[in-house]
Design a protein with these regions (language model features):
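An N-terminal hydrophobic leader/cap segment in hydrolases
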Residues: 1-46, 54
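Alpha/beta-hydrolase active-site loop
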Residues: 109-131
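Alpha/beta-hydrolase fold nucleophile elbow
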Residues: 131-144
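Acidic catalytic loop of the alpha/beta-hydrolase fold
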Residues: 215-219, 246-248
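Catalytic histidine-centered segment of alpha/beta-hydrolase-like enzymes
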Residues: 244-255
Length: 269
């Protein structure tokens, strides 16, 4: 890992203020503790003293490839009870992780926690795989805000991860906060100081798949293009879903989305 690109909690001081956080995180508690679909199990992974993160594991097969997935800022893991079967049907095990304050997780969501917690989550996820004798290869995936923790893990553990998948990801935190209408005077120079995602992409050389909606107005397609162009991966692919926006990308592009995902995981698993 390139130490020059590593972030410390002090780096997030400008971001982790209530007047900024309220524009970014929308925590919601899980009203359904038990999964609504077969072959799904809830897990709690400790990430800090007194704080555990809720995850939901959807099993296709013990030998299938495994995706550790970070969702968007308005979602919780149990929402994927309706989507995960599409992943398992193409032969992929999916583990969806929450953030602090989301689902059944403890704590309060912050930028610092969002970037720190993926490391113990990754260790906990690997423990789940070992304990259950799930032998497939490991991938990381992030949607929207979740692109940041996914890229953090891909950047940090390339020798353990077979591939990175980004859906509707953002290139830099400054541009993201602009799009979320965070008042500029509350951020100072943070736009230049913390680029979050794009700064790590040249150092990530594992296979990378980027999926983005053509008409995404929340995180415009240019973010996906920038991440793709900045990637240091020898194998990389940008899939643009025609006619799709931020929140209907899976529905509109389901066939192309799942086909690309299956091809990517199979080809690099």
């Amino acid at each position: 890992m390139n130490e020059e690109l590593a972030h410390s909690e002090e780096d997030f001081a400008l971001l982790d203020r209530p007047e900024v956080l309220r524009f970014v995180f929308y925590p919601r508690k899980d009203m359904f503790a038990r999964p609504m679909v077969e072959n799904a199990t809830p897990h709690m992974i400790p990430v800090d003293e007194g704080v555990s993160i809720s995850c939901r594991f959807y099993l296709a097969d013990k030998k299938a490839s495994n995706i550790l997935y970070f969702h968007g800022n308005g979602e919780i893991a149990s929402d994927y009870d309706h989507i995960a079967p599409a992943f398992t049907q193409i032969g992929v095990n999916l583990c969806v992780a929450d953030y602090r304050g989301y689902g059944s997780s403890g704590g309060t969501p912050t930028f610092a926690a969002m970037m720190k917690d993926p490391h113990p989550l990754f260790d906990g996820f690997k423990s789940i795989l070992r304990q259950n004798k799930y032998s497939g290869r490991l991938f990381v995936m992030g949607r929207s805000l979740g692109s940041a923790p996914a890229i953090e893990l891909a950047f940090s553990y390339q020798e353990q991860i077979r591939g990175l998948i980004i859906e509707s990801g953002f290139a830099s935190v400054g541009r993201l906060l602009d799009l979320l209408s965070v008042p500029a005077e509350r951020l100072g120079s943070v736009r230049e100081e913390l680029s979050f995602n794009i700064d790590r992409m040249p150092a990530i050389t594992i296979p990378t798949l980027i999926i983005h909606g053509e008409y995404d107005s929340l995180i415009p397609l240019q973010h996906g293009i920038d991440l793709y162009q900045g990637s240091g991966a020898r194998y990389k692919r940008l899939l643009v879903i025609p006619g799709a926006t931020h929140n209907d990308i899976f529905l509109i592009g389901m066939e192309a989305y799942l086909s690309a995902l299956k091809e990517f995981v199979t080809g690099h698993g």
